[in-house]
Amino acid sequence: MKKVLGLVVAAAMGLSSAAFAAETATTPAPTATTTKAAPAKTTHHKKQHKAAPAQKAQAAKKHHKNTKAEQKAPEQKAQAAKKHAGKHSHQQPAKPAAQPAA
């Protein structure tokens, strides 16, 4: 009678009646000799500590520029000379236009 009541309650609660019946009917068997596995040997990895860098100003930390002291500044040119740098060598001197006889 208790099993039937248990099944009804289990069905009302939304549990599987077969699982509930199997759970209540059988008692858990005592486990036989359980042996614990030996814990795995753990290896500890040591971190390599880097040497502390020299202290810098905030602006120096943010702006990493490759500056060379020996590098000289390029010659200043007019804008037209910069744009047409390669075209000057191929031009030939202009010939005077032939004037028709009057």
Swiss-Prot record:
Summarize what the UniProt record says about post-translational modification.
Proteolytic processing gives rise to the active protein.
The pro-peptide lies at: 22-58
Q: Which InterPro entries match?
A: Acid_shock
Which portions of the chain have biased composition (kind: Low complexity)?
Answer: 22-41, 91-102
Which Pfam family, any one, appears in the UniProt record? Asr
The entry's function note states:
Required for growth and/or survival at acidic conditions.
NCBIfam families for the chain: acid_shock_Asr
Q: What is this protein called?
A: Acid shock protein
